[in-house]
Amino acid sequence: MAKRSILHMFDPMPNNSPFDINMALDAGFDVLMPYSNVKLETIHNLTQDAIFSRSPSASKKTAIFIGGRDMGMAIDMLQATKPAMVPPFEVSVFADPSGACTTAAALVACVEKALKQHHGKELKGSKAVVFGGTGPVGIATGVIASLQGAETILVDHLSIDSAKDAAKQYNRRFGATMSGGVARNDEEKAALIADADLVFCTAKAGIRVINAAVLAQAKQLKVAGDVNAVPPSGIEGIELNDLSAPLNLANQATNAVGVGALAIGNVKYQLQHELLKMMLEAEKPVFLDFREAFTKARTLV
């Protein structure tokens, strides 16, 4: 009898994400096994239980997905699986906490494409501001943009120290060069975007972060991307399906365009589907996080 494909879903939170479960089933996995409240120190043993219970030939039909809501923890868990592998007993692993890796990759890829198409510019050398920058999507967005050469600021809505700490932590981990900023009010938001080329809005759903008055202070804005699909939009003037639509509220910034949440979400959905399929189809184990996600996202926009 043919071996069925199994996805072991490790999550440090009390519940696994129904979104990820649906995506994994639709990508072709036969059996999904969710694990909640998983501790970092248990990853090694869980991984070895997964690899040694099937023959090396069946390893291609076994994979691990790491969820949760903490980017650092998810990457730590992914790294913890690697020394647990004993070739030829090894499986593929994909970390995507709260969909942060795939959402961020889709967001940056969409903004990058718009930047090239409408302004003939690259991420390298651009100034990027990430609102909601201390959350998982914001952190991944910031790291991706920074590694591509953008001067990147992670923005927290309450504390400059939180933003600086996040930037320092992830700079050290991934070789990025981000800085921290704070936006407690419209004046601070306006100061941050005044000379920004790119604005990424990755704040909580249903919160208007950038209003028309703030946008009007942007003097060199080229592209803004908003991942908030719950009204009101995170950036006023960007509609859900906008894909490089004129951002007229940024009236000091010539030819500024916006990318909306559903346009980004369509790429994110395709991307997560493709990365899950990649684990099923790979001849050799793959280890996937936001870096591999961004590489793939560029082929989908």
Can you name each region flagged by the protein language model?
Residues 2-3, 230-301:
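Adenosine-phosphate binding glycine-rich loop
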Residues 1-89, 291-301:
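N-terminal ligand-binding/catalytic initiation module
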Residues 95-113:
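A glycine-rich, Thr/Ser-enriched phosphate-binding loop motif common to dinucleotide/cofactor-binding enzymes
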Residues 104, 135-141, 163, 207-210, ...:
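Short glycine/serine/threonine-rich phosphate/pyrophosphate-binding segments
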Residues 86-94, 124, 253-255:
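Glycine/charged-rich beta-loop-alpha catalytic/anionic-binding loops adjacent to active sites
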Residues 14, 69-73, 99-103, 133-138, ...:
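Gly/Ser/Thr-rich loops at beta-strand to alpha-helix junctions
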Residues 176-258:
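Rossmann-like adenosine-cofactor binding region
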Residues 114-198:
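Glycine-rich phosphate/diphosphate-binding loop of Rossmann-like nucleotide-binding domains
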